[in-house]
């Protein structure tokens, strides 16, 4: 396969290298990743400045491209400009830190997989608990296993997978679960501080004690030491509500 690897932690991130080491054994792997960390930039792209691409001579070998833009920019460039033929698969990760529940909406890692999905390229976003995780290599090996197994199942159009892993050795992982996205609000708090001039400034801070999730959701599974796999659609239409709205007559 022709595989593009990307992330939002930047081209020098350990999680990206762990994936490269595993997948480059049997596939052509091209790394197209942000030149610096671009965490939590969501699905932003660069419209008002040119994108610079610097090909790196990486110690691991292979093709590595550092891009001045966002994770979504990296995937767009990889599909439209840098790879010929188009990639068969895009893998985004391994992210340092989970992208479950509401954090999917902020994540550059998830957005990169979504961007590939928009172009009809199969894709998967992979994230692991921990800052930084201790088991990137095992996470990369597990990702390879998932890709091989999931290749047996044809994914529906406009769908990609969001995978979250506990930061545990493989023998301590309790299982793998296909589950829904948790809908709890993000576990954030805002810290207000004062600078040396007495002016207020604010930091977002993550509250890891914010709920265990409910039911068969990604957050709940991860609390139990289980790998969560959530199918995500690029079609944001709520079809149930759409059918109800069609019952209304709105005249201008």
UniProtKB/Swiss-Prot annotation:
Nucleotidase that shows phosphatase activity on nucleoside 5'-monophosphates. Its main location: cytoplasm. Belongs to the SurE nucleotidase family. The keyword Hydrolase applies. GO terms for molecular function: 5'-nucleotidase activity; metal ion binding; nucleotide binding. It is found in: Cytoplasm. Its cofactor is a divalent metal cation. The keyword Nucleotide-binding applies. Binds 1 divalent metal cation per subunit. PANTHER family: 5'-NUCLEOTIDASE SURE (PTHR30457), PHOSPHATASE, PUTATIVE (AFU_ORTHOLOGUE AFUA_4G01070)-RELATED (PTHR30457:SF0). NCBIfam families: PRK00346.1-4 (NF001490), surE (TIGR00087). InterPro entries: SurE, SurE-like_Pase/nucleotidase, SurE-like_sf. This is 5'-nucleotidase SurE. A divalent metal cation binds at residues 8-9, 39, 95. It catalyses: a ribonucleoside 5'-phosphate + H2O = a ribonucleoside + phosphate. One of its GO terms (cellular component) is cytoplasm. Pfam families: SurE. Its EC number is 3.1.3.5. Keywords: Cytoplasm, Hydrolase, Metal-binding, Nucleotide-binding.
């Amino acid at each position: 396969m022709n595989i593009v690897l990307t992330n939002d932690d930047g081209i020098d991130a350990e999680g990206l290298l762990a994936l490269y080491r595993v997948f480059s054994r049997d596939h052509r792997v091209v790394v197209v990743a942000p030149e610096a960390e671009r965490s939590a930039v969501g699905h932003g792209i660069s419209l008002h400045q040119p994108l610079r691409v610097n090909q790196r001579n990486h110690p691991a070998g292979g093709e590595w491209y550092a891009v001045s833009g966002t994770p979504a920019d990296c995937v767009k460039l990889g599909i439209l400009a840098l790879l010929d033929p188009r990639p068969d698969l895009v893998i985004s990760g391994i992210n340092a830190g989970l992208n479950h529940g509401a954090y999917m909406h902020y994540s550059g890692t998830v957005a990169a997989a979504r961007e590939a999905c928009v172009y009809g390229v199969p894709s998967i976003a992979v994230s692991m608990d921990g800052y930084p995780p201790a088991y990137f290599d095992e996470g990369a090996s597990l990702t390879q296993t998932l890709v091989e197994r999931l290749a047996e199942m044809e994914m529906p159009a406009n769908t990609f997978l969001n995978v979250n892993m506990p930061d545990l050795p493989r023998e301590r992982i309790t299982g793998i679960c296909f589950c829904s996205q948790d809908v709890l609000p993000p576990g954030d708090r805002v810290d207000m501080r004062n600078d040396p001039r007495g002016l207020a400034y604010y930091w977002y801070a993550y509250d890891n004690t914010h709920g265990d999730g409910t039911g068969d959701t990604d957050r709940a599974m991860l609390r139990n030491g289980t790998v969560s796999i959530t199918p995500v659609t690029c079609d944001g239409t709520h079809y149930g509500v759409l059918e109800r709205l069609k019952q209304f007559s709105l005249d201008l």
